[in-house]
Swiss-Prot record:
NCBIfam families: propeller_TolB (TIGR02800). PANTHER family: PROTEIN TOLB, PROTEIN TOLB HOMOLOG. This is Tol-Pal system protein TolB. Part of the Tol-Pal system, which plays a role in outer membrane invagination during cell division and is important for maintaining outer membrane integrity. It comes from Syntrophus aciditrophicus (strain SB). Residues 1-31 form the signal peptide. Pfam families: PD40, TolB_N. The gene is tolB. GO terms for biological process: cell division; protein import. Belongs to the TolB family.
Length: 452
């Protein structure tokens, strides 16, 4: 069943939940049923979504009968965990009776291969919208979760996202990632702009936001661990300085402006330090800066070029790129700069390391033929795995907060894409596409204000 054994018991709990970040109230019934989405044997979870029915005979906004299930299907599909069954030819669901509480035809849904069913309904009064969602376990023939959301019509997308996050939490034990954004740079000729896009933007095509612009280059966006700031390098004043800005675009401030190259690496897990690549003392070396005081301390000392530093999740080690061996390779050192050791030996060009938030693995890009591909390697140097394939340049990997997905940029055929990769199944989806050059994607932490 889904390639793994499903939980045998279901503990039903009744609770009332108030959504602090949302203008509607939730009532829920939920149970613990975990499916191992990290198993090599994992198969997508077969799920069906029924048309939604008007509640209590409310016939207003009939288009929502198809809008809600369509949005639920798109949102489930974005996770990469579900096999959404085509409802064509499926059983006549509760929308034919007008009673959202009616029992689904479990046997008929099961004959279509469904293991779970989502059904629901809606009603409206003036500008207020009420939506119900229910998750049914078809195999066990019982309801696992029921939620009701109340808000404005502009909140219906957020209602769908919040419910799917609850489904993910219940079935997989994960938190989901719709409350995250991905920052990336768009180049148009000589000018550049920094943008963010919400992970759920494909649901209805919205949620792309411009953060900052420059008539020259912007490089290396980096999220602070609390999601309040983006650090990046820009040539807006004639040389590569480091700036910080809020994701809304306010509070732009220059924080590093040494002579020569200034590039941000990564914020420390506690947000107190920022790794840097500076050339103020000659060649490019790795430094760490105290964010409050602005004081910097040098970590590497050699004649090579050292760039792209990132922290381990516990803040005790740093991965970076150095050409000290003659070609760019990934190295690891202690947070104080000691105990440097080479990590990658396969390939003659490996760069842009990204340490998984779960620990254990580092993603990076490596040159293969005339293009670049994304790889992962265990933090001890073993188990090298190529994660992408195909023509073009696959670059700038960045992990999702749960460490199960990667975002990266792909340049191929005159188009640029910001893609999402499932690190287990290797399934790839496109989040954003343009004829302009898109690069340097950076995945945010979970954002408290994310459900917009």
């Amino acid at each position: 069943m889904c390639g793994v054994r499903r939980g045998m018991g279901v503990l039903l709990l009744f609770c009332a939940v108030a959504l602090c970040a949302m203008p509607f109230v939730v009532r829920s019934v939920w149970g613990k049923v975990y499916i191992d989405i990290d198993s090599p044997a994992f198969q997508k979870i077969p799920i069906a979504v029924a048309d939604f029915a008007p509640l209590n005979g409310n016939q207003g906004h009939a288009d929502l009968s198809s809008w809600f299930p369509g949005a639920v299907r798109k949102t489930l599909d974005l996770t990469g965990y579900f096999n959404i069954l085509n409802r064509t030819g499926g059983p006549r669901d509760q929308s034919q009776t007008g009673a959202v509480q009616a029992q689904a035809a479990y046997g008929e849904w099961r004959s279509l291969g469904a293991e779970y069913l989502i059904q629901g309904g809606f009603s409206s009064r003036g500008t207020q919208l009420v939506a119900e969602f229910r998750l049914i376990d078809i195999v066990q023939g019982r309801q696992l979760m029921g939620k009701q959301y109340t808000g404005g019509f502009e909140d219906r997308r957020d209602m769908v996202i919040r419910f799917v996050q609850e489904v993910l939490s219940l079935l997989t034990g994960g938190e989901g990632f719709f409350d995250t954004r991905i920052a990336f740079v768009v180049r148009q000729g000589r000018s550049s702009s920094l943008h963010t896009v919400g992970f759920g933007s494909q649901i209805d095509g919205r949620d792309l936001a411009r953060v900052a612009g420059s008539p020259s280059l912007i490089l290396s966006p980096r999220w602070s661990p609390d999601g309040r700031y983006l650090a990046f390098s820009s040539y807006r004043d004639g040389k590569p300085d480091i700036f910080v800005v809020s994701p809304s675009g306010s509070g732009l401030k220059k924080i590093v402006s040494f002579q020569g190259l200034n590039l941000p690496g990564a914020w420390s897990p506690d947000g107190r330090s920022l790794l840097l690549t500076l050339s103020k003392d000659g060649n490019e070396e790795i430094y760490v800066m105290d964010v409050r005081s602005g004081q910097v301390r040098r970590l590497t000392r050699n004649s090579a070029i050292d760039v792209s530093p990132v922290w381990s999740p516990d803040g005790r080690r740093i991965a970076f790129v150095s050409n000290i061996s003659g070609s760019p390779q990934i190295y690891v050192m202690n947070a104080d700069g000691g105990d440097v050791r080479r990590l990658t030996y396969s390939g003659n060009y490996n760069t842009t390391p990204a340490w998984s938030p779960r620990g254990g693995k580092i993603a990076y890009e490596g040159k293969v033929g005339s293009g670049y591909q994304i790889f992962s390697i265990d933090e001890d140097g073993g188990n090298v795995r190529q994660l992408t394939s195909g023509a073009g340049d696959h670059e700038f990997p960045s992990w999702s907060p749960d460490g199960r997905f990667l975002t990266f940029s792909l340049r191929s055929g005159g188009r640029s894409r910001i893609n999402i990769l499932n690190a287990n199944t290797l399934e790839v989806r496109t989040l954003y596409e343009s004829t302009d050059r898109c690069l340097g994607p950076a995945w945010s932490p979970r954002l408290k204000q994310a459900l917009r």
